[in-house]
């Protein structure tokens, strides 16, 4: 399905933003038009669903009139003391069964069609959101929380799905029911209809006041629920730290505070909203009493039959339900429009700069690995709206093929940023980066990144087997190649001691592996990729000293004839680097070999000696 034109509404943000009842959109009409564009491909289904809804309501609304006829037959028999006409009653009962049966069938058809439409649109939205997230630049994620993105993909899409599946059907059936019942009430007796409608404005007023008073408490309820969920998630993910520092009492106190506020807000919201039904029922009963009095008087004077009074009473009983449903749907549509705004806002976000004027990417074997940073400038966004503050300023450096370049410096100096720019995770503010003399912008991101093997500080593993995780470095690798990579990374022995070996399942978050084992598996990926350029970001930060020595030897073999960028805080690990770049505040303040830098007695020597004090 072609994407409809996306507006760019600025809805409220936050992980719980998609869950607040009564949340109002900034531009209701524009959002609903955009949402309507997703409904257009299903016009035929929606038309059939509408016809089915109308027929379902028509058959169910006519039924009380037919039942009233049965009441008249019985009443006539009693009044005239004549035998009861069982044939007529039997015919009426069969007709009622047919009417209700056909009504149920059409209602089922409508429900089936609406469920299909809502699920297909939800699928389409989730697909577009997933693809959109893949195309967003990393700087977008620097200024948003994970909870916010998850809320848009899950909560907001679920809200839209629920509305399309239930609320649209309610609008159809409620509107047709109101028109049908009102028409038949007028047909039975216009004066009785006028009496019945006297209580209608009062019902609307009650519903409006209850919704108005409960809405604030519902918002508080969802806000406190978000705080409780966030606290629980925080305590669960950091339970080891909580226990280690005896933080349970403080954690319990914080939870108790949020939980009490949640309970109070929930109690108020549920109590106030719970008064709607009894109050509307009271008003309905008052109207019912008035109808009984007026109907009895009219029946006594022969102006209306007993059967019609019985049908009219049924209509009155049914009349308030679709009105309440429509009142509720108005609020639901407001929340849905707000949720849709947040979804469409994400879909309208600026994407990565598209690849243009691309050159054919050379074979990996032909890449020499010469990397040139030519007056590079770059800054991270400080928040969602502010200008970027430069971190890397006029960075210039030439990495020769096969060189081992170590990048060191204090936290925040820009070490990891350099390799992120090399992989085009971010676009430069100024200058350019060349691979073998060609601007990396002339290659597609996918091709460019295939030239780099990496072991990052965040040793990310996904749920699946050990073999699958290592194969991520080269998706078409054989089992033999995977095993060789594991041997090179010194993780093969551990894998084979496990019951399932390379088929061992890695749990969510890799909780069944130690930090060192996670690091070794990510290293095995890099061995398997065998790329011409290597990036090692704190590659041995999570392993013990003995394992580190083994890995350093293996890394030396791996880095042979490959340009390698090594980022390390432990300066003892980069003594053998060909060139060490010392960074501070985004600039290279010193460069040279380990011994040369020590002899300069500058910033590098201060860093080096501080690790041995």
In which residue ranges do the predicted regions lie?
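Transmembrane helix-loop-helix hairpins at lipid-water interfaces of multipass membrane proteins
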Residues: 3, 46-106, 187-191, 302-306
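Transmembrane helices of ABC transporter permease
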Residues: 45-58, 99, 166-220, 291-304, ...
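Cytosolic ends of transmembrane helices, especially the final helix of ABC transmembrane type-1 domains
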Residues: 115, 224, 247, 271, ...
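Juxtamembrane loop-to-helix connectors within ABC transporter transmembrane domains
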Residues: 21-23, 30-31, 39, 71, ...
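Helix-loop junctions and hydrophobic alpha-helical segments within the transmembrane domains
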Residues: 71, 129, 133, 242, ...
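ABC-type nucleotide-binding domain
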Residues: 362-613
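An intracellular "coupling" helix at the cytosolic face of ABC transporter transmembrane type-1 domains
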Residues: 138-139, 157-164, 168, 172, ...
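Hydrophobic alpha-helical segments in the permease module
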Residues: 95-103, 107, 200-207, 273-287, ...
């Amino acid at each position: 399905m072609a994407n409809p034109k996306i507006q760019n509404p600025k809805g409220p943000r936050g992980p719980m933003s998609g869950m607040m009842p009564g949340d109002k959109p900034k531009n209701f009409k524009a959002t609903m038009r955009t949402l309507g564009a997703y409904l257009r491909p299903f016009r035929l289904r929606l038309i059939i669903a509408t016809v089915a809804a109308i027929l379902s309501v028509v058959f169910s609304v006519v039924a009380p009139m037919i039942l009233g006829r049965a009441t008249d037959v019985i009443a006539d028999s009693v009044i005239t003391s004549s035998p009861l006409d069982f044939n007529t009653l039997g015919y009426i009962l069969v007709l009622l069964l047919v009417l209700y049966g056909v009504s149920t069938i059409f209602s089922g058809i409508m429900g089936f069609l609406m469920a299909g439409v809502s699920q297909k649109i939800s699928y389409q939205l989730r697909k577009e959101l997933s693809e959109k997230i893949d195309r967003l630049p990393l700087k977008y994620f620097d200024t948003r929380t994970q909870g916010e993105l998850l809320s848009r993909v899950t909560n907001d899409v679920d809200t839209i799905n629920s509305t399309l599946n239930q609320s649209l059907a309610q609008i159809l059936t409620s509107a047709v029911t109101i028109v049908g019942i009102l028409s038949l009430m007028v047909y039975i007796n216009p004066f009785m209809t006028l009496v019945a409608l006297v209580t209608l404005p009062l019902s609307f007023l009650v519903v409006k006041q209850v919704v108005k008073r409960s809405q604030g408490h519902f918002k508080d309820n969802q806000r406190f629920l978000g705080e409780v969920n966030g606290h629980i998630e925080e305590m669960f993910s950091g339970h080891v730290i909580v226990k280690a520092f005896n933080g349970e009492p403080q954690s319990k106190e914080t939870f108790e505070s949020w939980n009490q506020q949640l309970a109070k807000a929930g109690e108020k919201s549920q109590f106030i909203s719970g008064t709607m039904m009894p109050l509307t029922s009271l008003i309905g009963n008052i109207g019912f009493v008035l109808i009984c009095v007026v109907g009895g008087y009219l029946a006594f004077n022969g102006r209306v039959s007993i059967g019609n009074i019985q049908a009219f009473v049924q209509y009155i009983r049914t009349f308030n339900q679709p009105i309440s449903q429509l009142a509720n749907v108005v609020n639901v549509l407001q929340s849905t429009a707000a949720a849709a705004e947040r979804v469409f806002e994400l879909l309208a976000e600026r994407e990565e700069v598209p690849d243009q004027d691309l050159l054919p990417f050379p074979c990996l074997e032909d890449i020499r690995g010469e990397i040139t940073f030519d007056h590079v400038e770059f800054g991270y966004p400080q928040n969602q709206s502010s200008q970027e503050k430069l971190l890397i300023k006029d960075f210039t450096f030439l990495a020769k093929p096969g060189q081992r370049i170590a990048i060191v410096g204090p936290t925040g100096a820009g070490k990891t940023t350099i390799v992120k720019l090399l992989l085009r995770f971010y676009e430069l503010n100024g200058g350019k980066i060349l691979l073998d003399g060609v601007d990396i912008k002339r290659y597609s991101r996918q091709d460019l990144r295939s030239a780099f093997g990496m072991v990052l500080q965040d040793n990310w593993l996904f749920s699946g087997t050990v073999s699958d995780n290592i194969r991520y470095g080269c998706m078409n690798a054989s089992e033999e190649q995977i095993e060789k990579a594991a041997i090179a990374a010194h993780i093969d022995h551990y894998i084979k001691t496990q019951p399932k070996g390379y088929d061992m399942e890695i749990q969510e978050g890799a909780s069944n592996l130690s930090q060192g084992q996670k690091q070794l598996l990510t290293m095995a990926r890099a061995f398997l990729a065998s790329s011409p350029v290597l990036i090692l970001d704190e590659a041995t930060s999570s392993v013990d000293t003995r394992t580190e020595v083994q890995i350093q030897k293996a890394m030396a073999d791996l880095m042979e004839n490959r340009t390698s960028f090594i980022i390390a805080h432990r300066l003892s690990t980069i003594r053998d680097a060909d060139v060490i770049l010392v960074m501070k505040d985004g600039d290279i303040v010193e460069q040279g070999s380990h011994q040369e830098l020590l002899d300069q007695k500058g910033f590098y020597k201060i860093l080096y000696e501080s690790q041995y004090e």
